C-alpha cells in the first residue's frame, strides 16, 4: 500500500491538477492524506469535489509550519511506502512506477525534477543541477542538502525512525533524508519525475544563496547531526 502525504495551505490554484496527476498512478488500495493548515481559500472544497475515497483530509497544526503539517500527514499514513508531495507540483505519469522499482532494493529514493514557472513553462531542465545534488551522506549533511521532499519516496521503516520530528530540525525532508541515509540506504536517481513549480514568492532555487544566515545554516547542520547521533545512542 502507498500513502501519499500532502501538506496544504491556500493551494486552490494548483491542488486539483496535482491530485489528479497522483490519483492516476495509484491503485484502489492506496491513499492520499492531505493535512491542511487552516486554508482560507477554496483548497478544501476543491479537494472534496474530486470525490475520491482514496483521499483523506485531516486538520493540520495551524502553525504555518510545512514541517509540522507534513508530520501530521505522516502520522496518519497507513502504507508500507510513503511518497511526499507538494500542493503545487505535478507528478509525471511514471513517478510511482519508477520509484517503486527502486524501493524494492533501497529504503529511500530521491529523484530529479524539471523546474517550471507557475504555468509549467520550462525554466531549468534539472533541479539536481541547480541544487548541486549528489549521492553521499557526509556531503548531504555538511555541505549541500540534496533531499527535496516532493522528490522523495521511502519505506515505512524510514517513517518510523524519523518520527516524531525533533523540534529544532530545519525542514522535514532534510531530517527524513538524513535518517534514511545513516540508518538505512538512499538512492539518488537521475529520472526527472516531478514538474517542480517555482513561483516568484518561493525560495530561490539557483543554488547560490539562502534565506538563512550562515549562522542559521550552521545551527541547522549541528542540530541535524546531533539528532542523527541520538538515533544510535
Residue ranges of predicted features:
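Short, well-formed alpha-helical segments that are part of the catalytic scaffolds
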Residues: 11-24
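Short aromatic/hydrophobic "clamp" motif used to bind/position activated sugar donors
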Residues: 82
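Short beta-strand/loop segment that forms part of the nucleotide-sugar
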Residues: 29-38, 58-60
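Conserved nucleotide-sugar donor-binding catalytic segment
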Residues: 135-207
Amino acid at each position: 500500500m502507498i500513502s501519499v502525504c500532502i501538506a496544504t495551505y491556500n493551494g486552490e490554484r494548483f491542488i486539483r491538477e496535482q491530485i489528479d496527476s497522483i490519483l492516476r498512478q495509484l491503485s484502489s488500495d492506496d491513499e492520499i492524506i492531505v493535512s491542511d493548515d487552516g486554508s482560507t481559500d477554496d483548497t478544501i472544497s476543491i479537494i472534496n469535489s474530486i470525490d475520491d475515497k482514496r483521499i483523506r483530509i485531516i486538520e493540520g497544526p495551524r502553525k504555518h509550519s510545512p514541517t509540522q503539517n507534513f508530520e501530521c500527514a505522516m502520522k496518519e499514513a497507513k502504507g508500507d511506502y510513503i511518497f511526499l508531495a507538494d500542493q503545487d507540483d505535478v507528478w509525471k505519469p511514471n513517478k510511482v512506477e519508477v520509484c517503486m522499482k527502486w524501493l524494492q532494493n533501497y529504503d529511500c529514493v530521491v529523484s530529479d525534477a524539471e523546474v517550471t514557472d507557475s504555468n509549467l513553462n520550462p525554466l531549468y531542465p534539472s533541479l539536481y543541477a541547480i541544487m548541486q545534488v549528489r549521492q553521499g551522506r557526509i556531503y548531504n549533511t555538511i555541505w549541500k542538502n540534496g533531499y527535496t521532499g516532493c522528490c522523495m519516496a521511502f519505506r515505512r521503516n524510514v517513517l518510523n525512525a524519523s518520527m516524531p520530528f525533533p523540534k529544532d530540525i530545519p525542514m522535514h525532508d532534510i531530517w527524513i533524508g538524513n535518517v534514511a541515509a545513516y540508518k538505512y540506504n538512499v538512492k539518488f536517481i537521475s529520472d526527472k519525475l516531478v514538474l517542480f513549480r517555482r513561483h516568484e514568492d518561493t525560495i530561490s532555487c539557483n543554488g547560490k544563496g539562502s534565506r538563512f544566515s550562515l549562522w542559521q545554516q550552521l545551527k541547522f547542520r549541528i542540530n541535524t547531526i546531533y539528532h542523527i547521533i541520538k538515533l544510535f545512542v
